[in-house]
Amino acid sequence: MSQFQNWSRREFVVGSGLWMAGAFGGVSAQTAESAPSETKPAPESKPIPKSELAIHGGPKTVSKGVPGLGRRWGDPERQQLEEMLQQDTLFYWGGPRTQLVKERFRQVCPLKYVHTCSSGTAALHIAVAAAGIGPGDEVITSPITDPGTVIGILYQQGVPVFAELGRSTYNLDPEDVQRRITPKTKAIIAVHLAGNPCDMDALKKIADEHNLVLIEDCAQAWGAKYRGRPIGTIGHIACFSLQNSKHITCGDGGIVASSDERFGPNLQRFGDKGYDRARGLGLDVFATNYRMSEPQAAVVAAQLPRLEKIAARRAELGNLLTEKIRHIPGILPHQVHPEDRCVYWFYMFRIEPKAFRCSRGEFFKALAAEGVSCASGYIGKPLYGEPVFQKHAFFAGRWPIKEFGLTTMDYTKHKNPEAEAILATGIRVTIHEGMTEEYILAVAQAIEKVARHYAA
C-alpha cells in the first residue's frame, strides 16, 4: 500500500477501493459457459470530455464502476470435490484427481512429464533443482518479478543474475542476456510478465549456443501463446502458478512440466522429498516436500476446461485497450508481438516524463479518481534493490557461497536502468475477463483525458 501513503483520505478511498474492486481472478463458474468465444465488434469510443479532472471536482469518466467477477467456482468444482470424497485416498500419488489434472493440463500445454505441486514458487524450485543448479551457479532472470522466481535459485545456493528488460514488453532483453553470460552461467529463467510472451526464439538460441537450461516462468501466463505455440512448450522446463489471483486457481498450487528426458523424470522426485515412487528407488537426491493434495487437484481439474475462454477474453480486452491508447502522445502501451497472445494478468502502460507537467504519481492518482482500477508500477523496486539483496542476507543474515568465495556478486552495485525506469513510469491497470468493452473504452478515455490535461 506504499503508493497510497501521501494521499488524502478522499484519494485513498477512490484509488484503493477501485483497485480492490477490480481484483485479479478467473471467470466465475456461473458465467463460464456464457463467456464469449468469438471477438465481437467493440463499441465506438465516445468523445473525450473537456471537463475538469475528477480529482479536481469534475465528473468521473468511468461512471458505472469497475465490473466484478463474482465467485470463481461453482458446480464443476463441487462435483469434482464430491467425487474426490468418495475415494480411498487424498494423497497425490495414484490419486484420480491428480491424474485428471495431468490429462487436462496436457490438453492446454502438451508436455510429457507433468507434476503437480504446492505453489508456483515450488514449481520453480523444483525446476531449478532438476536443472542441476548448485553452489555458485548463475541463473539469468528478470529483476521485475515475484520473489518466487529466484527463491529456488538461492535455496540451491545459486546466484540470480538480473538482466535488462525491453522498454515496453517488460521482458528479458536477449542482447543483455547474452552480455551477462559467464563460465558460471547454467540457466535462464524467462519470466512471461503479465502473461506477455518473452522473445523465446532468441532466448532458446542463446541457451542452445551456451548449453544452458531454459526455464519458463509461466506463473502469470496461463493460456498465452508464442507464435501460435502454447507458452511453456518452447523452453526445457515450464512452471505455472495456481495461486488465488491467477487465471485459474485452487487457492494455492503449481504445476511443473517438461518433455526433456534430462529433466522430466526428475520433477516428481524433487517435489516429493526425493522419493522415486514410480521405480521404488531409495533417496538418491535431496529435496523438500512440495506435494499438492487431491482436494486441491479436484478444484484445478474443474477449472482447466475454462482456461481457453478466460485467456481469449483477456487477450481481447487488453488488445482493445492498446488500440485505443496507442495514439496518445506520451503514452507507451503494453507492447505485444502481433503473432503472440498476451493473456494480461495485468495491463501496464508507461508515461514519458518529459511529455507531461506531472509526476507518475500525480498521473496515477488522477486516473484512479476518474474511476479506473489501477496502481503505480508493479513491484516497488527491482528485486536486487530489496533489503535482503542489498544486505546479501538470504540465510539467517548470511550468504554462504559469498563467504566461501563461490561468487563475487555484489547487489549493492547492480543496476538495470531500463527496469528501474519501467517501475518509475509504469501504471498498472486491472484487466479481467469479467470486464466489458464499454469499461475498457472508458478506461482509454480516462487515460486520454488525464494525458491531455497534463500535456507539456
Q: Residue locations for each model-derived region?
A:
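PLP-dependent aminotransferase-like
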Residues: 54, 129-218, 225
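Active-site region of PLP-dependent enzymes
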Residues: 221-227, 231-346, 381
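Phosphate-binding glycine-rich loop
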Residues: 91, 96-138, 152-154, 162, ...
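N-terminal secretory signal peptides and thylakoid transit peptides that target proteins
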Residues: 2-20
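Short, conserved charged micro-motifs
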Residues: 355-362, 436-441
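C-terminal segment of N-terminal export signals and the immediately downstream linker at the start
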Residues: 27-91, 97, 107
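Conserved PLP cofactor-binding pocket of PLP-dependent enzymes
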Residues: 276-279, 323-325, 338, 364-426
